[in-house]
């Protein structure tokens, strides 16, 4: 296998990793950093590769929710109150990360984008998820709900308040640190704010659209001169792989959260963080 072919195989592999992990609370960026380091993936485009292949994953979400997305756009433009309120909530949740990201993202990438940080944030994020999911279980012993769920005031996207949406947006800012997980921060942040788990997951999917599109376009704009034709080919391969794998994951996640908690993902994060820390130590 030639070096060029191996380069594209690695890009395809990382695209699969991106699609599988973007919409579950385990940190896709953290996994890309860890697996990219493991397989010695060196892209001349740097972190642009990681951001742009996320477009493949987000387009998968847009495809799955295309009917609801079109309804939202059409309703907002025609002045329908329910759709306008939902659009307002998405914008409120989007702007905190957009503002902080535009100002600090370069410093964040230079400071935090390495496996040691990922190990720490994986463990901390897992512990926080366990805390949220384990807050005083229901008296009937239900395995799929907790007191956090019982206290939820928003059980549908239309019931989310502007304060809850803003709280999700603030939580999303934490996801700029690799290993935190954008989906994990927004879903858990939503649950703490009083949004029911499945609804928080759906809102996280919709919020991913402007957030990830904006991040990808911004990174491309800032680094377009650094991209070579070789890098663009690798990005295209990773993009397609992320799109196809994300198509499978999004539907599976929606089915999963209807009947399960996120505890399994929390324990996975903790275990992976410990393994990475041990690997770095020895």
Curated annotation (Swiss-Prot):
GO cellular component assignments: plasma membrane
Nucleotide-binding recorded as keyword: no
Gene Ontology biological-process annotations: cell wall organization; peptidoglycan biosynthetic process; regulation of cell shape; response to antibiotic
Topology of this chain in the membrane: Multi-pass membrane protein
TM region positions: 6-26, 45-65, 85-105, 112-132, 200-220, 230-250, 262-282
Keyword terms of this UniProt record: Antibiotic resistance, Cell inner membrane, Cell membrane, Cell shape, Cell wall biogenesis/degradation, Hydrolase, Membrane, Peptidoglycan synthesis, Transmembrane, Transmembrane helix
Enzyme's top EC category: hydrolase
Pfam families attached to this UniProt entry: BacA
MF terms (GO), sorted A to Z: undecaprenyl-diphosphatase activity
Signal sequence bounds: none
EC assignment: 3.6.1.27
Subcellular location: Cell inner membrane
Catalyses which reaction(s): di-trans,octa-cis-undecaprenyl diphosphate + H2O = di-trans,octa-cis-undecaprenyl phosphate + phosphate + H(+)
Further facts: Bacitracin is thought to be involved in the inhibition of peptidoglycan synthesis by sequestering undecaprenyl diphosphate, thereby reducing the pool of lipid carrier available.
NCBIfam families: PRK00281.1-2, PRK00281.1-4, undec_PP_bacA
Function: Catalyzes the dephosphorylation of undecaprenyl diphosphate (UPP). Confers resistance to bacitracin.
Family: Belongs to the UppP family.
Name the record gives this protein: Undecaprenyl-diphosphatase
Species in which this protein is naturally found: Bordetella avium (strain 197N)
């Amino acid at each position: 296998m030639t070096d060029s072919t191996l380069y594209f195989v690695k890009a395809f592999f990382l695209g699969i990793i991106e699609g599988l992990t973007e919409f579950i609370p385990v940190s896709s960026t953290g996994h890309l950093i860890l697996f990219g380091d493991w397989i010695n993936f060196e892209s001349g485009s740097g972190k642009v590769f990681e951001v742009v292949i996320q477009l493949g994953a987000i387009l998968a979400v847009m495809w799955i929710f295309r009917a609801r997305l079109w309804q939202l756009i059409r309703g907002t433009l025609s002045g329908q109150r329910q759709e306008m309120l939902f659009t307002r909530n998405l914008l409120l949740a989007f702007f905190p990360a957009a503002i902080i990201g535009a100002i600090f993202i370069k410093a964040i990438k230079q400071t935090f984008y390495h496996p040691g940080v990922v190990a720490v944030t994986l463990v901390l994020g897992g512990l926080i998820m366990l805390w949220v999911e384990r807050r005083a279980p229901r008296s009937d012993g239900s395995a799929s709900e907790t007191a956090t769920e019982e206290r939820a005031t928003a059980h549908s996207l239309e019931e989310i308040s502007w304060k809850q949406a803003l709280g999700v947006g603030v939580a999303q800012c934490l996801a700029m640190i690799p290993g935190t997980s954008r989906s994990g921060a927004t879903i858990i942040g939503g649950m703490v704010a009083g949004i029911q788990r499945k609804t928080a997951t759906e809102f996280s999917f919709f919020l991913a659209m402007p957030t990830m599109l904006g991040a990808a376009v911004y990174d491309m704009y800032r680094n377009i001169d650094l991209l070579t034709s070789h890098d663009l080919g690798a990005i295209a391969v990773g993009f397609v792989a992320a799109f196809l794998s994300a198509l499978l994951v999004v539907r599976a996640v929606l089915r999963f959260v209807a009947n399960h908690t996120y505890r399994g993902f929390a324990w996975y994060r903790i275990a992976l963080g410990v393994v990475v820390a041990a690997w770095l130590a020895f």
